[in-house]
Amino acid sequence: MSRGRINDRRPLVIGHRGASAYAPENTHAAFRMAMDDAADGIELDVRLARDGVPVVIHDATLDRTALVRGEVESCDSTELTECRVGEWFNLRHPKHAQESFAYESIPTLAQVFESYGSRLIYVEMKCEDAARRPSLARAVVELTRAHGLAGRVVVKSFEHDALSEVKRLAPEIRTAALFGRSWPRPLVSGARIIAAAERCGADEISLHRSLLRKSTVEGARGRGFDVLVWTANSPFWLRRAFALGLRAVFTDCPADMHNWYTHHIPGDAGRRENG
């Protein structure tokens, strides 16, 4: 079985919500910083606004990042893109605060595609309401196709039914099945993870680092999956990812991780072609 696996000397370094250790997550500032920091790509979260426009934000509410009360799905995209989502970062991380961060707003997915479509983009669909997942999947597929990015966008989600819908609509778009800390780690087997990924037709398996085991990786690769790990913010996880031959690591600090690879991986560890 082949799922278009991409092999190379080292895992890709993907900015998790951009360079989110040093700039407000899921903002242009974080995405630009990740690109400037030699990340191979960026990762972001999308939700549907009330008017059906995919917007880039992790939480279901605005409380944490916009410092105002409200639910994302209860607001139109025009309202959401006016929300400032950087001041919270300055307050929580004064060491990395910048005055300009306070003016960062919620981007739309279309804006991200227009600005960063030359690089690899992992789009995580967030939707707790199962009834709305087909609409979110359709909107992401339509934007990906409209921008000609089927070869550079990978759609991922914990909601595997949403990934099945993406594959039904657009078999050419790669998808990644997410598995997080909520899985019962002492009990879950690699076989269960692989079976779940196969059921939704995923191309890649994205594991929380607590689920990263050699047997799982080998089993997944034997079934044709690429394997990813999140969130890797220390050299320990980079060494592990390299040793296991993972496709990518998701990190909040891409500059630090890229520099570590550059200085510790023998041979050509520079940026590789994104598939």
Can you name each region flagged by the protein language model?
Residues M1-G275:
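Phosphate-group recognition and catalysis centered on beta-loop-alpha active-site segments
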